Design a protein with these regions (language model features):
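N-terminal active-site segment of His-dependent metallophosphoesterases
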Residues: 6-90
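A short acidic-Thr-Gly-centered motif at the start of a beta-strand
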Residues: 26-35, 65-66, 93-97, 175-178, ...
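Metal-dependent catalytic neighborhoods of phosphoester/phosphodiester hydrolases
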Residues: 79-93, 115-122, 232-233
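Catalytic-core regions built around general acid/base machinery
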Residues: 89-99, 165-172
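Active-site HxH/HxHxD metal-binding segment of metal-dependent hydrolases
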Residues: 100-135
Length: 263
């Protein structure tokens, strides 16, 4: 008989009320990680370099207190936009990758940055998704209602301002990562379509069709993209986007064997 995987409250909870709610939660399935491996999965950062630094400190403390043979950091995308320090966030991730095993996924906001670099007219749409603070983080002066000439100039300046390390990091982002009984992705997956045949558009953008689906998927889906007030753990998915840019909460999911915890 499969026993339910335990959903443990975070060691540093957001509040007593949430902690009491989380203590009663349990998922019916029993998704497993490989023996001897611990994964730290992180939700949407959105330019909050300050919160990312704090999160790294929490993870380091956790590793010191509970050492394990192998660890993997997984970031679910949307490192940029909305918050004020997108460039600094990429610096932190690149630096962390020098000393830790990491897998960084692509989010829809990174998609917009790529689109802007290929087609400057996308700026008017990108700015609706919080793209102007990203330009500012690279020392550029954003223009709210830029005409085509100004859009092209901003695009050229961003190409020049973008460090090679950032370009390489962004070019290397993956659409998904799978490990054990878990499938990590930015937005979610389309129900009824095998995980091996998912479209990039859905992996980066899907919402209602995925969020309202209650039946099990091939694996437990760990995702971000849709902000929630607290981590949302369900029988078929775990949402760890807690709206960091607005709430000041950057969530880190800790997976080890059948344990589902937060740090």
């Amino acid at each position: 008989m499969l026993r339910g995987a335990i959903f443990r409250p975070p060691r540093k909870a957001y509040g007593k009320v949430q902690l009491l709610m989380w203590k009663t939660r349990r998922i019916n399935a029993s998704p497993l990680m490989p023996e001897g491996l611990r994964i730290y999965a992180v939700g949407d950062v959105h330019g909050r370099a300050d919160l990312l630094k704090q999160l790294f400190s929490r993870v380091d403390e956790d590793l010191k207190e509970y050492p394990i043979g192998e660890t993997l950091h997984i970031f679910l995308g949307d490192y940029i936009d909305r918050g004020q320090d997108s460039a600094a966030v990429l610096d932190l991730l690149i630096e962390r990758a020098r000393t830790h095993r990491m897998s960084c996924l692509k989010g829809n906001h990174e998609f917009f940055l790529f689109e802007f670099l290929e087609n400057p007219s996308v700026l008017k749409h990108w700015q609706q998704y919080g793209g102007l603070p990203t330009l500012a983080s690279y020392g550029l002066t954003p223009i709210t209602n830029a005409d085509p000439k100004e859009q092209a100039e901003l695009c050229a300046r961003l190409w020049y301002a973008l460090p090679k390390s950032h370009s390489q990091f962004l070019a290397g982002l993956k659409l998904f990562f799978t490990c054990g009984d878990f499938f990590f992705v930015h937005a979610g997956v389309r129900p009824g379509t095998p995980l091996s045949r998912q479209r990039e558009e859905d992996l980066l953008w899907i919402r209602d069709e995925f969020l309202l689906h209650e039946k099990p998927f091939e694996k437990m889906i760990v995702h971000g993209h849709t902000p929630v007030m607290e981590p949302d753990v369900r029988n078929n998915r775990i949402n760890i986007d807690t709206g960091a840019y607005a709430t000041g909460r950057l969530t880190c999911l800790r997976l080890e064997r059948d344990k589902i915890e937060f740090v």
